[in-house]
């Protein structure tokens, strides 16, 4: 029961902090990045129907100040992905499905001793860039992340 009350307080405090952020200027994109309710909801929920594990939420809540700091100081992004997704939109008082391009940018850094990735999202050509997610230190094993050549001199294991 005590863990639940601590979780509730942490979530409430984080939500207040997140809401008070509003937007921050990003040198990497040379524009403001907005911290909308969609981004906070994505920290709590994986999708519309499933909540993230509590331990994952707590870690993301605690890393949020680092994510904001990273957006403020990073001058480059390391990842980019563009997809097309369907969204429900209102058109002449009716709900219709509309396909829009969705762009994701990943800013990766070790900041204050923690490796994190901040994901910025933009929907459509006219959408505003907004915070989408924070990914704590992770392990990659996807094909696109395979290292084909090294740019490092020497052996990092031995040096």
Language-model features, listed with the residues they occupy:
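Ribonuclease/tRNase effector modules and their secretory precursors
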Residues: 1-159
